[in-house]
Amino acid sequence: MAKPLTERFFIPKEVKVMGRWSVEDVTVEDPSLKPYINLDARILPHSHGRYAKKPFGKANVHIVERLINKVMRSGASHYKAGGHFMRREHRSIMSKKMKAYEVVKEAFMIIERRTKQNPIQVLVKAIENSAPREDTTTIAFGGIRYHMSVDVSPLRRLDIALKNIALGASIKCYRNKTTYAQALAEEIIAAANKDPKSFAYSKKEEIERIAQSSR
C-alpha cells in the first residue's frame, strides 16, 4: 500500500513567497487597486507567460512577479530620466528573469532589515502611494488640440506605479557604486513613506498636478 503524500513529500504548512515572506497578513487599503493586486500564496512567483495574451490577464499575475518583470526593463531609452538615457546600463538583467528574481529577493531582504516589516506589505504601500488617479489626454476640437484631465483605470495605475519604481531604482544606481538591489529597496521604502526623494511618488504627484490644471 502506498504511503500518504505527507510521508512521501515535504508539504509546507504555510506557503511563503520566495520561501521567506507570508502574504496572509498583507492588506491593500486602496479599494480600486485591491482586485488587481494579486497576493496568492506561491513559493515561486513565475507564471510562465500563461496570461500574456489574455485580456486583463495581468490581474492574475502575482504582484512580486510583476515587479520582477519591470526590473528586467532596459530603463529610459527614448527619453531622459534623471538627466540620462539609460538603455544599456542594466543590460545584465534584461530578459534574464532568474537574475531579476535574485535582485528583487535581495532588495526585499534589505527592506526587511531596515523597516522590520514584511517587504511585500511595504511594496503594496509603495504602489498605493505611487499610482496616479488622474492623467491627461489630448483631444482635438475645431482643429485645435487641448489637454484634458481623465481618470486612470486601476490596471494602468498599477502599471505606472511599478514602472516608475523600477525606473527610479535605475536612476539611483546610475554610474555609481550603489547596486540595483540597494537602489530598489531605497525606492520602495521612500515611496511607501511618501518621501519626495522617491522618483515614483514625485512622478505621481507631477502627473496629478498637471491633470488638475487641465480640468
From Swiss-Prot:
Q: Domain of life of the organism in this record?
A: Archaea
Q: Which UniProt keywords apply?
A: Ribonucleoprotein, Ribosomal protein, RNA-binding, rRNA-binding
GO cellular component terms given for this protein:
cytosolic small ribosomal subunit; ribosome
Instruction: Enumerate the SUPFAM superfamilies for this protein.
Output: Ribosomal protein S7
Presence of keyword RNA-binding: yes
Question: Listed GO molecular functions?
Answer: mRNA binding; rRNA binding; structural constituent of ribosome
What the record says about family reads: Belongs to the universal ribosomal protein uS7 family.
Provide the function of this protein.
Answer: One of the primary rRNA binding proteins, it binds directly to 16S rRNA where it nucleates assembly of the head domain of the 30S subunit. Is located at the subunit interface close to the decoding center.
Q: What is this protein called?
A: Small ribosomal subunit protein uS7
